[in-house]
């Protein structure tokens, strides 16, 4: 599968939830652009884009199971979901492992290993900062609240 096919599959997975579809398109667009401007190699760029597309894959399940999309729950549920989602995508095991790692850590702002993780987290932290009141930015938690 190419990026467009993974995007199409993720949109279908979203079951018409316009918020989820809009969010994944925004995150993917920013991740794609930043990755290209940073000059990522092809494999890292592709991994970043797939992680950006699938990073909130657990949101529908979390809404149903827990009544919210708490970041910790997304991380717990997201890894196995994205592995299953990508099973027929024709990616290497290493690439699926990396995407699953990124999806299951996208609310964790410590121990960032790799530019793909740094870009994905950077996009999320920017969004989180918008939610905080002026003067409160220094109080960013180690894990984000629900998204």
Language-model-detected regions and their locations in the chain:
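His-Asp-centered metal-binding catalytic motifs of divalent-metal-dependent phosphohydrolases/nucleases
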Residues: 45-67, 78, 100-107
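A generic alpha-helix surface/boundary motif
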Residues: 4, 28-29, 79-81, 97
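Divalent metal-dependent phosphate-bond-processing catalytic cores, especially two-metal-ion Mg2+/Mn2+ enzymes
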Residues: 12-25, 29-41, 54, 91, ...
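An active-site-proximal "capping" alpha-helix that borders the catalytic cofactor pocket
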Residues: 27, 72-88
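Membrane-helix interface segments
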Residues: 42-44, 95
């Amino acid at each position: 599968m190419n990026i467009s096919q993974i995007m199409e599959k993720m949109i279908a997975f979203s079951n018409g939830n316009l918020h989820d579809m809009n969010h994944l398109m925004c995150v993917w667009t920013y991740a794609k652009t930043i990755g290209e401007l940073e000059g990522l190699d092809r494999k890292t760029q592709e991994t970043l884009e797939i992680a950006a597309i699938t990073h909130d894959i657990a949101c529908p399940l979390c809404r149903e199971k827990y009544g919210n999309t708490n970041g910790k729950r997304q991380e717990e549920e997201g890894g196995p979901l994205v592995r299953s989602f990508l099973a027929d995508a024709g990616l290497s095991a290493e690439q699926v492992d990396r995407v699953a790692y990124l999806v299951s850590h996208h609310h964790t702002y410590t121990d960032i290993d790799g530019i793909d993780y740094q870009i994905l987290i950077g996009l999320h932290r920017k969004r989180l900062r918008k939610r905080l009141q002026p003067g409160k930015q220094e109080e960013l938690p180690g894990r984000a609240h629900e998204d």
